[in-house]
């Protein structure tokens, strides 16, 4: 006898009347409670780092629930994390894209295997309902798989070019990593919008300094856990924790990183875009939200359309860039 294949979880396939899903989630909530309230260090060069004091994270569902105590990093911790990423980058790039793809796919598989546990922690941490939390965790795994698949399908973007009729000339376009990337993730998609940019940078041969939102720090912890358990070497992805005005600012303003990905507010994102590339061109990818329309066709079922628009606009309190804002 073989186990039945696991149902693929997506935002589209999730249903509130799925009793099996609810039973698995409820069991995961009980398991997740055992992880609440503990202390969580930063991870720099594969080593735990205590930082300068701690900050507490409490659940928006119930302020009596202590999600955890997290290390409060300093500017010096960020500098050390950047140095660790720099020291690891050449060996990571030399590993070869095929091996990096293998490690990213393994990370994605671990996240999928732990979907209920990670979703339960996310629901407690940021207050998402269980369906949205489950959808996000599986989306996180799929984003990692996407970057891995793009590298595979395109042979890591190594392409022969025209020799202009000279048989002695061999010209190729090749892909090379930039070096060290900073990734600053938001609270509203604390796993997906960390896993996506982190894995995109890693599969390309870059190393990473990752800062989760302080209100999404547990999701940062589980991403680092999955990367470690998949076999990603120490120092390749480093996690710093703490306030945006110190830890985030040190990362965003550093001349020692080669690119940055940020998801968050318009004010911070525009300031980052203006300042990060001022001295010289560097990749600066900022996502600051949008105005998302819904179009209701004449042939639509109006009851279903109205419910869909309502859920799209006000799910998770509307606190997401994908929330419907125009009809």
List the predicted regions and their residue ranges.
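A structured beta-alpha segment of the ubiquitous adenosine-cofactor-binding alpha/beta core
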Residues: 170-171, 238-261
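ALDH superfamily catalytic-core signature
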Residues: 231, 259, 267-327
């Amino acid at each position: 006898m073989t186990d039945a294949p696991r149902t693929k979880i997506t935002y589209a396939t999730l249903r509130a009347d799925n009793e099996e899903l609810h039973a698995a989630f409820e069991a995961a909530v009980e398991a997740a409670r055992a992880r609440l309230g503990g202390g969580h260090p930063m991870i720099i060069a594969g080593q735990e780092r205590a930082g300068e004091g701690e900050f507490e994270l409490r659940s928006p569902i119930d302020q009596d629930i202590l999600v955890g105590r997290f290390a409060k990093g300093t500017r010096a911790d960020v500098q050390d994390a950047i140095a660790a990423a720099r020291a690891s980058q050449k060996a990571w790039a030399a590993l070869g894209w095929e091996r990096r793809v293998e490690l990213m796919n393994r990370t994605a598989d671990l996240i999928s295997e732990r979907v209920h546990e990670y979703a339960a922690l996310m629901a407690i941490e940021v207050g998402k309902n269980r369906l949205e939390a489950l959808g996000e965790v599986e989306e996180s795994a799929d984003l990692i798989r996407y970057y891995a698949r793009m590298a595979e399908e395109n042979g890591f973007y190594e392409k022969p070019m025209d020799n202009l009729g000279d048989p002695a000339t061999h010209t190729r376009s090749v892909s090379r990593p930039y070096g060290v990337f900073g990734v600053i993730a938001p609270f509203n998609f604390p796993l997906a919008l960390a896993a996506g940019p982190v894995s995109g940078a890693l599969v390309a041969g870059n190393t990473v300094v990752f800062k989760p939102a302080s209100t999404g720090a547990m999701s940062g912890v589980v991403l680092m856990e999955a990367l470690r358990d998949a076999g990603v070497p120490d120092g390749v992805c480093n996690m710093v924790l703490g306030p945006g005005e110190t830890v985030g600012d040190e990362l965003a303003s550093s001349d020692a990183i080669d690119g940055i990905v940020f998801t968050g507010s318009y004010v911070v994102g525009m300031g980052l875009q203006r300042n990060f590339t001022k001295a010289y061109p560097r990749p600066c990818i900022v996502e600051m939200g949008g105005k998302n329309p819904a179009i209701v066709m004449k042939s639509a079922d109006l009851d279903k359309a109205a419910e869909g628009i309502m859920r799209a606009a006000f799910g998770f309190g509307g606190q997401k860039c994908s929330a419907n804002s125009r009809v």
